[in-house]
Structure formats: C-alpha cells, structure tokens
Amino acid sequence: MLNKSFAMYVYVQQFHRDMPPTPVFVYGQSLQTATFPGPTIVARYNVPLYVTWENHLPDAHILPWDPTVPTAIPKNGGVPTVVHLHGAAQAPDSDGHAFAWFTRDFAENGSTWTQKTYTYPNVQPAAGNIWYHDHALGLTRASLLAGLLAAYIVEWPELEMPFNLPSGEFDLHLVIADRKFNVDGTIFMDTVGAVPSVHPQWQPEYFGEVITVNGKAWPFQAVQRRRYRLRILNASNARYLNIRFSNGLPFTVIASDATYLSRPVTVSNLLLSPAEIFDVIVDFSLVVNPNATDIELLNSAPYPFPTGTPANATLDGKVMAFNVSAKWQVGDDMPMQEPENSTVVPEIGVPFAKVTALPPTMKTRYIVLYENMTSNDPNTAKTMNLYINGLRLEDPPTETPISGTTELWHVINLTPDNHPLHLHLAEFQAVQMLQLVDPDTFKSCMLKHNDTFACNLDQHAVGALQPVPEEEKTWKNVVKIPPAYVTSVVVAFRLVHNNMPYPFDATAAPGYVYHCHILDHEDNAMIRPLTLLP
C-alpha cells in the first residue's frame, strides 16, 4: 500500500528559449518540483495507490472560461478542480466525477465530492499507459490547456519482463500538446465565442500552431543507434496528429492506450486522436546516414480532423527532432555495450487483446453524436453545442449496463468531425466501421425524431466497410468515431485480462461518464452519465 500527496499550483515555465516565461497550472508534490506536464506516476499492477489531491490554485483561472456552458462555479471564488485517472479502473468516488470538484483547501466542493484521498487499485492490464488530468465540470478545456495533465504507468513485471523491451533511458514518454501564445508568453485562448450571442467565450475547438512535447516547443532528443520505446500521448485539446518520421523510419506498435496488442504491428505513420496513446518501438540503428544526423517527427493531420485546414509545414506540421548519434567506426572509442537483441522487436503480445467472437445475447445500444448549428448552410453555420443522443449530462442516465457484462454499442456520428469517444471505467474496442448511405436524409430525420428505428437506420447503414486499423485492435479507452459512419464497439464492464469483476463496487454513486475527448466538445455538452447496475 502506497500513500502519496500531489497538489495543483500556478507556476511559470519556459516553453522555448526565445519566448518569455509562461504562467501555467502544474501538478507536483511541492511547488519547487511541480512541472508541466506533471510528474509521471509509476505504479505496480495490483498494488493500490492512495493519492490525496490538494488544490493550491489562485482565486481566478489564468485562462478565460464561459459560464453559459455547464460549469462548476463556486460561490466564493477559486478554481474548481478534480483529478480523473484516464484509462484506469477505480471506484466511482475515486474516478474524478465532473461534479466532485473542490476549491483551494477544500473550501467549497461540488455535489458529488466525498473525500480528499482517492484509491487507485491499479488492476487494469499492461502495457499500463494511462494519464491523469483535470475533469471539473465545464473547465476541462481551460484547465488542461493551462497545464493540468500528466502520464501514469502501471508496471506488471511478471508479464512484461519476458518481452525484454527497452527500459531506463531508452524508454521515453512523449506528451504532445499544441499551444498558442501571446507575445508576452502567456497562453492564448479565445475570449470571444463562435456564437457570442449564445456562448460569449466558447469555441468548438482549440488549435495552437506551436507543438510542445514534454513542455517544450519543438524540442530535440538525443538518441543512440539502437531501439527505443516511445510512449506517445496526444494531450491536445482538439488536435489530431498524423505523425511520421521525415526519413521514413517505421513505428513498431506494441500497445495502444493501456493494453498490448496480440502481436506487434509495423506502420509508417500513426494517427492519434486527442487523449489517445500509442506505445511503439523505434529502431534508430536503421538510420542510413552514418554521421550524426537529425530526423524530424512530422504531423500532417488537418484541423479539425478529417477535413479541416492542412497542417503548416513549418509550424504545426513539425513535432520534434531526434539527434541520432554517429555510427561507430573502427578506431573510435568503444560504445556502451548494447543487449544482443537491441535491434530486434520480440513477438510480444497478449492473448486477450482482440475480440474474436460476439456473444449472441450481448446487449446492444445505439449512441448518436449530434452537433447543433446556427443554420443549415455549411458555409456559414456555426456550432452552438454538441450532444450525445440529444441529451445533456444533467439528464437521467440512459446507459445503465450490468456490472460484469459486455455490450455492443453502435456509435453513429452525424457531425462533420471525427470524435475520440472515451468511456470512464470500461475498456472497449472497435470491431466494425460501416459507412452511412445518404447520411443527410438520415440526419434530417434524426434531428426531428432522435430514433434510429423510425429513421430506418438499417436502410442507411449499408455503405462501405472501413477496416479497423491493426494497431487499434486491442482494448482501448479512446476509440476514433469517423463522420457519417456507424462504428460498432464492444464495451467490457469487467476486467478484460482475467474476465473477473471489478474489485470494488462499480455500481455506487456517483457513477461514471462517457464523452467526446475533444475537450471543447466535452464541455458543451458532449458528455453523458454512465451508471452501472448490480
């Protein structure tokens, strides 16, 4: 049993040597050690961690926020906050519920707040790549943009040691997030909304032209000519990343989000939605140039994804650079001895990663993603809000699965954007992506009736099948939902690696939520309650 205390502070951080220092919100065990991103917490499988979260934030937020979207607003000032361990299985009272917020010194708290110390059982399967971040109602986009996010690893030595993966200095976290800055170094966030008569400040997506990695703008990382493990997290508010190396160096994907694949998959590029993690092996010994050389990690995803503005080759099209050491030559000093398999990827994998069959009695649900626009003209229409099944977070729960069961959700995207769907507690994976035929007619009917059967979904869900990428065929905590598609996902309300029930009461109050992880969408109001039943 381990006990830790972490707090949130306001601090100043240098994102680039040519920029003024930037005020940020940070996590840390003290102000002196706090950073953006926050400290990476390393836990052990099946060893509980007890964390007391403290709020030492100032009286006012450092970024603008919009009180016209559902928001935690304390009566006596202060910045509300609550921590969600994203991708973990924990009891509802430790999940970071949106209404479980609290202000500095616990002076005020939300309606579902009950305790200062959270219990993290650490029972989800390896590879254990998860992260923690703020989750206060209506403030996720502002508070994560301000800096309240960090990586969390659950190690499982008995499972992972035979894989002989790169470790220590050869195991790197890359926490990627886009930002926009004012000339004085402060983070820029719009103060005027897309439809100010409805929401004075809220914008449907935040995009910054500066790409930061581990708190630095366009950084450099020195690497040797050997294998590295890169745990890549897209911690951007809304930006998708389609990353590749400038010299074509491949990624060997071993895990996606918290779970290993059934076998490694080698790809030339990776598409990461916000909140998505890929765990990859990169072999820098494959770099052809024998001299010390730089290779760039590039991004080509348009924003919003998939049909928005192309990435700028000199700004958001660049992520970082890797400084690859010179190749060892006869007569040079002998390099550090490397393990014999340093350029070999083992055939690691876990047998429970892929869904192989769907039980015929599986409960089926239909989840519909809506975008409420100012008009029907695609050239002038502005987004006012977004909903799931036409409902708000405050509306009664309609997704009430039985704890320990598995369900099939058909997620129908009637918006022009790709949405990263995130479920708290549960793990899930896409098994089919089916294109809608004549989606405008179906959407028009759904906006009137909000009923998939009355609108003849079976006559529209007959288009092309898009294959689920091999690197995403495992149990995930974020699944990409493309526009004008029905994406079918298998959702497990149990521990997938051993088929056991949760070691806590997942049916307790205040329950869980599921939502789009484009933070601006989540805040207004693409989020719904998820209540498990006994």
From Swiss-Prot:
Taxonomy, superkingdom: Eukaryota
Tissue localization of expression: Expressed in roots and basal stems.
The record's free-text note on cofactor binding: Binds 4 Cu cations per monomer. The Cu cations are bound as 3 distinct Cu centers known as type 1 or blue, type 2 or normal, and type 3 or coupled binuclear.
Plastocyanin-like domain residues: 219-291
GO function term, MF aspect, one: copper ion binding
Protein residues bound to Cu cation 3: 135, 424, 515
InterPro entries: Cu-oxidase-like_N (IPR011707), Cu-oxidase_2nd (IPR001117), Cu-oxidase_C (IPR011706), Cu_oxidase_Cu_BS (IPR002355), Cupredoxin (IPR008972), LPR1/LPR2 (IPR052152)
Membrane topology, as annotated: Peripheral membrane protein
Binding site for Cu cation 2: 86, 133, 517
GO biological process: cellular response to phosphate starvation
Cofactors, names only: Cu cation
SUPFAM superfamilies: Cupredoxins
Alphabetized CDD domains for the sequence: CuRO_1_BOD_CotA_like, CuRO_2_CotA_like
Residues bearing attached sugar chains per UniProt: 109, 234, 291, 312, 323, 341, 372, 450
Function of the molecule: Multicopper oxidase that may play a role in the maintenance of inorganic phosphate homeostasis.
Protein name (Swiss-Prot/TrEMBL): Multicopper oxidase LPR1 homolog 3
Species this chain originates from: Oryza sativa subsp. japonica
This protein's encoding gene: LPR3
